[in-house]
UniProtKB/Swiss-Prot annotation:
Signal peptide: none annotated. Residues 420-432 have a biased composition (Basic residues). Residues 394-432 are annotated as: Disordered. It comes from Mus musculus. Keywords: Calcium, Metal-binding, Phosphoprotein, Repeat. One of its GO terms (molecular function) is calcium ion binding. Residues 45-80, 81-116 form the EF-hand domain. This is EF-hand calcium-binding domain-containing protein 3. It comes from the Eukaryota. The lineage of its organism: Eukaryota, Metazoa, Chordata, Craniata, Vertebrata. SUPFAM superfamilies: EF-hand. Ca(2+) binds at D94, D96, D98, K100, D105. Residues 395-411 have a biased composition (Low complexity). The modification Phosphotyrosine is found at Y273.
Length: 432
């Protein structure tokens, strides 16, 4: 055989140049696969929690979630999404391609690692809106269930515990993927626009090492708060919202239904029901007047005498006398409150409270004075606005002329025109 023929048969193929970026990619993939944890099966409690969350959706006759049910559930939670995006989300969640989301599709989507990481740790250059990031709608709806406490507390605990565990298992993989994408580091000060990402960030802080936590705090301190932020200001609540102004806001849903239910409530004065005010004046009428010169009631003096008589007390003796001490203390507080109420009524007469509202053309002075009479003895106002109006009405009826609490001597003789105007206004008074 010729030498040329031997060279032709023994000719080797040319070596290919190594592709370093491909090798690096394969290395990252093998390391990522090595860090993958075996997906644990759902426990019966977790499966029941997912079932209850699935039952909260609006479903069709077959018990599945169709497009109309998804639209109804989104509207119920106050989320905004157009029809095209809803159909796109339905297509992503419909794994068996039957046009609906059954419970099997629901579980498979919410337990999928890629979709979970997509909802929790989105990349920086990917838009976090639901419209441009399909596949995370079910995670957002589940987060809304947790935020609004739509589910039972037991189910919420199971769901939060499950996703916290999933995030902790994926934490090492997240750190490696962020290392591979060095140019896509997320800014620590940018607030997450996804509620699921916010929950995940809180879980990340709980498992963060001390060194990483210090770095997180240092970066957080470098973020300057906006001076015009509403959270950096002290809130000022109006004393009387109906008088001080009206703040336009988003109208509540089913306002007519709520108004109808409110009108059906058999309540004479809604404020008494709302603040759970007790009728302390009726209780104070039953309190015996103070006869001793010390200024204390007979019950308190009897308890004081008992304390001086017996020096050593046991737990049984203290429990037996506890109710007597409580009763005597309440009687004393009611008596003090009743005396203070009389002083406040005298002050109302002295400052002519009914004329103050007439002169300023503002009836809110009744509420202002009522707030001023708040007492710790009964933990409420001693004189309500209703009590002051009833007092003025009784005083006007008892007076010989229907000129209110004012008398002709109160007006200046040198200004008869002003006196006639004030007398005309005071005779009109407020509507009782």
């Amino acid at each position: 055989m010729a030498v040329s023929e031997i060279k032709a048969t023994m000719k080797l193929k040319p070596l290919k140049a190594p592709v370093f970026h491909k090798r690096d990619k394969d290395l990252r993939g093998s390391f990522s696969d090595h860090l993958k944890h075996k997906e644990s099966k759902l426990s019966p409690a977790q499966l029941e929690a997912f079932r209850n969350a699935y039952n909260f959706f609006t479903k069709d006759r077959t018990g599945c979630i169709d497009s109309h049910g998804l639209i109804s559930t989104i509207a119920k939670l106050g989320m905004n999404l157009n029809t095209y995006d809803i159909y796109n989300e339905l297509k992503c969640a419909d794994l068996d391609r039957d046009g609906k989301i059954n419970f099997s599709d629901f579980i498979n989507v919410l337990t999928d690692k890629k979709l979970f990481l997509k909802a929790v740790v989105p990349e920086k250059k990917i838009c976090l809106d639901l419209a441009n990031n399909p596949g995370i709608l079910l995670f957002e709806i589940l987060s809304k269930f947790v935020e609004t406490s739509s589910l039972h507390r037991k189910d919420i605990i199971e769901l939060v515990s499950y996703f916290r565990k999933r995030f902790q298992e994926s934490h090492s993989e997240i750190m490696w993927s962020s290392y591979g994408r060095r140019g896509l580091k997320s800014e620590i000060c940018s607030p997450p626009r996804s509620s699921t990402a916010a929950f995940a960030n809180s879980a990340r802080i709980s498992i963060m090492k001390e060194r990483d936590l210090y770095k997180f705090l240092e970066a957080l301190k470098r973020c300057n708060l906006r001076t015009d932020s509403p959270y950096s200001k002290i809130p000022v609540f109006p004393l009387f919202p109906d008088v001080d102004g009206t703040v336009m806001g988003k109208p509540f849903k089913d306002t007519q239904k709520i108004e109808m239910l409110r009108r059906k409530e058999p309540l004479t004065f809604f404020e008494d029901y709302f603040f759970n005010k007790r009728d302390w004046k009726t209780q104070a009428m039953n309190v015996k007047p103070l006869k001793s010169a010390s200024g204390y009631s007979d019950d308190i003096l009897a308890i004081d005498h008992l304390f001086k008589k017996k020096q050593h007390w046991t737990v049984t003796d203290a429990a037996a006398i506890k109710q007597h001490v409580k009763k005597a203390t309440e009687s004393y507080n009611l008596g003090i409150a009743l005396d203070h109420r009389k002083e406040m009524l005298n002050l109302w007469k002295k400052i002519r409270g009914d004329l103050v509202g007439i002169e300023s053309n503002n009836e809110s002075f009744y509420n202002t004075f009522s707030t001023y009479t708040w007492s710790w003895n009964v933990c409420q106002e001693l004189l309500s606005a209703k009590d002051l109006r009833l007092h003025d009405a009784s005083m006007n009826k008892s007076s010989p002329s229907n000129s209110g609490l004012s008398s002709p001597s109160d007006f200046s003789e040198s200004d008869p025109e002003t006196g006639r105007k004030r007398k005309r206004k005071s005779s009109r008074g407020f509507r009782q």
